[in-house]
Amino acid sequence: MASGILVNIKEEVTCPICLELLTEPLSLHCGHSFCQACITANHKKSMLYKEGERSCPVCRISYQPENIRPNRHVANIVEKLREVKLSPEEGQKVDHCARHGEKLLLFCQEDRKVICWLCERSQEHRGHHTFLMEEVAQEYHVKLQTALEMLRQKQQEAEKLEADIREEKASWKIQIDCDKTNVLADFEQLREILDWEESNELQNLEKEEEDILKSLTKSETEMVQQTQYMRELISDLEHRLQGSMMELLQGVDGIIKRIENMTLKKPKTFPKNQRRVFRAPDLKGILDMFRELTDVRRYWVDVTLAPNNISHAVIAEDKRQVSSPNPQIMCRARGTLFQSLKNFIYCTGVLGSQSITSGKHYWEVDVSKKSAWILGVCAGFQPDAMYNIEQNENYQPKYGYWVIGLQEGVKYNVFQDGSSHTPFAPFIVPLSVIICPDRVGVFVDYEACTVSFFNITNHGFLIYKFSQCSFSKPVFPYLNPRKCTVPMTLCSPSS
């Protein structure tokens, strides 16, 4: 009965705007009362839409500001009502022991629970240290106040971590988007050359973005949940600290355990200095190389082969293709002239018909599917040397050979002058070739004394360059198919 009356009174002194108990109540001449802050805010809102018109938010009857008056009577009722927070039934439930029905007056230090005098004498609490609630309330008030300050500090840290993770997420998105833009821009000039590299790098960046942003999004969600948990815990503590002594101590063990068990989880981050940084494959270098190849191709000459009595290579009718005959057949046909296959291999070299005595000259040779070859420039054969010189002995710049070659299908070499200890044997230097060339470009700058070799298959990558060549006499294009019977072909300028 009394509880119902209190409910009715509460409804009468509740603000129709904020639906809370009236604060500094003001009444209009129509009889409706509102919180001072609520009716003031409503008045300002009304002025924005209907100039000069003010009406009651409940009944819409117009009023003038001078007709608003403080309602002291309602304010007193609200003040009294605030003191009556619980109904007798609810008070009975909270203030009395649920097991024994006795009033809760004691606090068990070991179990950190509010108990009655019968609980104190029960087996559950026998031997425990118990105190009157008034004796421990201040101690726990200090503890909870300290915990509240600690939680507020951690909340600030959590909010900062949450902001940092959002900032890092945005930073990653911007940085990776920027990388995408750079990749697209860098590859634009070399689209035909770098289609594969572009696609590969973009896929890596997409995967990196997906993995990192997915992880950061998960971390962000965890940080939001962590922050929300702290807010709820802080709200609980604030409610206890602002409430009665009973509310402060009721269930305090649970909340203290929650505080003690709570740890601030920091999000997983990705140090930018450890990430896989995109590195374009030296786009400027490739562009310069591509331009260099374009430049030297301006000096392309139509080279043909010159048959001679020294070489036993097979030259096609168009004089553009040379191949090695079957060595065993040739040896049987020549009888004792060739004592070994090594001597025979030396005799498969041929010269181009054009002599080079000045200027710049360029040509390309198709060596696809060959397992062995030698090509470059030569100052001319030594007619009497073919019978007594070993396979590679002749291929030295000092003997007029500036050449590179392939052996056993995978070994690319450049032939340089032998050392002072082995003057009759060339110094064979391995070449690092990432993509095996099916087509090789040769460029001779006679005045600059250089011979350059380009991997046309790898977009004109420079294979090797001879510098300070001693061109004391005319030089000729040189091709040697070696013992591989697959032909070598001189490419026409229009190919």
Curated annotation (Swiss-Prot):
Region annotation Required for interaction with GABARAP and for autophagy: where it falls in the sequence: 187-200
Zinc finger (RING-type): 15-60
One Pfam family in the UniProt entry: SPRY
Renumbered zinc finger spans (B box-type): 92-133
Catalyzed reactions per annotation: S-ubiquitinyl-[E2 ubiquitin-conjugating enzyme]-L-cysteine + [acceptor protein]-L-lysine = [E2 ubiquitin-conjugating enzyme]-L-cysteine + N(6)-ubiquitinyl-[acceptor protein]-L-lysine
Subcellular location: Cytoplasm; Nucleus
Binding site residues for Zn(2+): C97, H100, C119, H125
Cellular-component GO terms for this entry: nucleus; P-body
Pathway(s) where this gene product acts: Protein modification; protein ubiquitination
Taxonomic superkingdom: Eukaryota
Disulphide bond pairs: none
Domain comment quoted from the record: The B box-type zinc finger domain and the coiled-coil domain contribute to the higher and low order multimerization respectively which is essential for restriction activity. The coiled coil domain is important for higher order multimerization by promoting the initial dimerization. The B30.2/SPRY domain acts as a capsid recognition domain. Polymorphisms in this domain explain the observed species-specific differences among orthologs.
Subunit comment: Can form homodimers and homotrimers. In addition to lower-order dimerization, also exhibits a higher-order multimerization and both low- and high-order multimerizations are essential for its restriction activity. Interacts with BTBD1 and BTBD2. Interacts with PSMC4, PSMC5, PSMD7 and HSPA8/HSC70. Interacts (via B30.2/SPRY domain) with HSPA1A/B. Interacts with PSMC2, MAP3K7/TAK1, TAB2 and TAB3. Interacts with SQSTM1. Interacts with TRIM6 and TRIM34. Interacts with ULK1 (phosphorylated form), GABARAP, GABARAPL1, GABARAPL2, MAP1LC3A, MAP1LC3C and BECN1.
Function: Capsid-specific restriction factor that prevents infection from non-host-adapted retroviruses. Blocks viral replication early in the life cycle, after viral entry but before reverse transcription. In addition to acting as a capsid-specific restriction factor, also acts as a pattern recognition receptor that activates innate immune signaling in response to the retroviral capsid lattice.
Protein name in UniProt: Tripartite motif-containing protein 5
Lineage: Eukaryota, Metazoa, Chordata, Craniata, Vertebrata
